[in-house]
Amino acid sequence: MASTLDSASLNLKVGFEIHQQLATKNKLFCNCRCKEAKEYDSSFVRKLRPTQSELGAYDPAAMFEFSKMRTVEYQAAFGSSCLVEADEEPPHDVTKEALETALIFSLALHSKVMHEIHVMRKIVIDGSNTSGFQRTMLVASGGHLDVAGKRIGVQSICLEEDAAKLISDEKGVRKFGLDRLGVPLVEIALEPVT
């Protein structure tokens, strides 16, 4: 029995997040090149664990990932990863080219650029980030995008680091390539539309 859903009768609104990798020379928090590795030179193993928030609570999604008790193996290639990606060295200053590109996106979308841009951390312990969190910055808010005669509002524009590349996920071991980890990307959150 086939049925159709009518978005108007459901009062359905849908918002989109657009993620775009930036074609910068270097990664977001180090001087490594943004290039895909053909082969990997070294590897290391980690088990990521959740930590309490400032309020003393554990993130439910982090607890769910932790319950899987997976081992994570990271593959690294010289030139496209360093101690920053391995979480063995503090991140460097934000790459100027990536920040300037995010500001250009913001101005093109008529968004209000923040007076100060701070690096925040989002908990991620599925193995796709060696540190257990993703670094992200709110660059601008508001604005709009005109598409096919319709104006779509922009909620926020963030500059963040991309996740490591999943190579395999077998028998309780996830393997990731660090060549993609830290590549800058812009995240544009659009307002819901009917």
What positions do the PLM features span?
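Basic, nucleic-acid-interacting segments
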Residues: 2-194
